């Protein structure tokens, strides 16, 4: 009885790990929203609406403000 229980648990663990591989890995993705104005929280609101992420205005090397959206994605 204990061998069959051990085998059953082992099979369940193997199947669970296979399902996790099929579903993909979660990672942090980044997207630049070039058409977004960086005033009055529009960057944060648009990023939240599009990808349920967090948006932040950052300054580029040429001193332009761009909206950078960070969100969780599956790769």
UniProtKB/Swiss-Prot annotation:
UniProt entry tagged with the keyword Lyase? no
What superkingdom does the record give? Answer: Eukaryota
Q: Keyword Coiled coil, does the record have it?
A: no
Tell me the InterPro entries matching this sequence: DEFL
> What cystine pairs are annotated?
29-73, 38-57, 43-67, 47-69
Question: What does the UniProt entry say about where the protein is found?
Answer: Secreted
Which PANTHER family does the record match to this protein?
A: DEFENSIN-LIKE PROTEIN 127-RELATED (PTHR33830:SF3), DEFENSIN-LIKE PROTEIN 184-RELATED (PTHR33830)
Family recorded in the similarity comment: Belongs to the DEFL family.
What is this protein identified as?
Putative defensin-like protein 126
Native organism: Arabidopsis thaliana (Mouse-ear cress)
């Amino acid at each position: 009885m204990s061998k069959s229980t051990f085998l059953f648990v082992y099979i369940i663990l193997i199947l669970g790990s296979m399902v996790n591989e099929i579903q993909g890995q979660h990672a942090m993705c980044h997207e630049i929203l070039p058409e977004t104005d960086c005033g009055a929280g529009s960057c944060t609101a648009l990023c939240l609406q599009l990808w349920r992420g967090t948006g932040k205005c950052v300054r580029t090397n040429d001193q332009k403000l761009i909206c950078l959206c960070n969100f969780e994605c599956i790769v």
